[in-house]
UniProtKB/Swiss-Prot annotation:
Residue ranges constituting the CoA carboxyltransferase N-terminal domain according to the UniProt record: 34-288
InterPro entries assigned: AcCoA_carboxyl_beta, Acetyl_CoA_COase_Trfase_b_su, ClpP/crotonase-like_dom_sf, COA_CT_N
Record-stated family: Belongs to the AccD/PCCB family.
Keyword ATP-binding: yes
Protein name: Acetyl-coenzyme A carboxylase carboxyl transferase subunit beta
Organism: Streptococcus pyogenes serotype M1
Residues binding Zn(2+), per UniProt: C38, C41, C56, C59
Record text on subunit structure and interactions: Acetyl-CoA carboxylase is a heterohexamer composed of biotin carboxyl carrier protein (AccB), biotin carboxylase (AccC) and two subunits each of ACCase subunit alpha (AccA) and ACCase subunit beta (AccD).
The organism's place on the tree of life at top rank: Bacteria
tRNA-binding as UniProt keyword: no
Length: 288
């Protein structure tokens, strides 16, 4: 009955396996380090167009930057003197994988811990400076972070210096348990002693500043500045919505929202922070 077989609707083509992979060899590869995708506007940006400040040319989004990059943008060239580098992070709870995570963070960032501390000059104004780096385990606050910031305030009291801190953190470091949480009280006590000495303390909130850092020294500055659109809060958005059973505003926990509600004194563009810091330090007695 082959004479009455229905004809196929489509022509059968046998694939040529020898052609497999030949196309991919002709497609040019673009190195990942050449471009960055803006988290806000989703545009692909040639990294050189971001500039030293790493600001999106399309929507002005502030990319997260390292402590070293922040240092370059802020202080007078060659003026930074790093302090407290000998303090080593321990693993008191023998938390699984913690030592490996610490080692990887050190290799990736070039830092000893999540905060860079020292003395520096900003437009000839001498300050005690701390810069938190979210690339180091999300700048979570462990015992060493708390100790370095506490010692910075104590040094500032001895040398009659204003303190400037760039905050960025995911909160307390869970791998260190209650010892991490105790840093909130320890640093806050140091802030109070510095304030009692009549010295100026300036905080700059950067993206993200959350958890125990927000609940302690980040919000204790005499003046609190923030970079545009920085995420600032204590608990996460979903946790709050689940707890209160309400939908939160779209801009909730953004720096602009906090300014509107009196928690932030001013939103300052990254490119203008250096001038603003120098002006505020000089206005409040200066650090000479």
């Amino acid at each position: 009955m082959a004479l009455f077989r229905k004809k196929d609707k489509y022509i059968r083509i046998t694939p040529n396996n020898s052609l497999k992979g030949s196309v991919s060899h002709n497609v040019p590869e673009v190195p990942d380090e050449l471009f960055a995708k803006c988290p806000a506007c989703k545009h692909m940006i040639y990294k050189k167009d971001l500039g030293l400040a790493k600001i999106c040319p399309t929507c002005s989004y502030n990319f997260r930057i390292s402590a070293q990059e922040r240092l370059t943008l802020t202080v007078d060239e060659g003026s930074f003197q790093e302090l407290f580098t000998s303090i080593e992070t321990k693993d008191p709870l023998r938390f699984p994988g913690y030592q490996e995570k610490l080692q990887k963070a050190k290799e990736t960032t070039g830092l000893h811990e999540a905060v860079l501390t020292g003395k520096a000059m900003v437009k000839e104004q001498k300050i005690a400076l701390a810069i938190m780096d979210s690339h180091f385990i999300m700048a979570s606050m462990g015992t060493v972070v708390g100790e370095k910031i506490t010692r910075l305030f104590e040094l500032a009291i001895e040398e009659n210096l204003p303190v400037v801190i760039f905050t960025a953190s995911g909160g307390a470091r869970m791998q260190e348990g209650i010892m991490s949480l105790m840093q909130m009280a320890k640093v806050s006590a140091a802030v109070k002693r510095h304030s009692n000495a009549g010295l100026f303390y300036l905080t700059i909130l950067t993206d993200p500043t959350t958890g125990g850092v927000t609940a302690s020294f980040a919000m204790e500055g005499d003046i609190i500045l923030a970079e545009p659109q920085s995420l600032v809060g204590f608990a996460g958005r979903r946790v709050i919505e689940t707890t209160v059973r309400e939908n939160l505003p779209d801009d909730f926990q953004k720096a602009e929202f906090l300014q509107d509600h009196g928690f932030v004194d001013a939103i300052v563009k990254r490119t203008e922070l250096r001038d603003k810091i120098a002006h505020l330090v000089a206005f409040h007695g200066g650090g000479q």
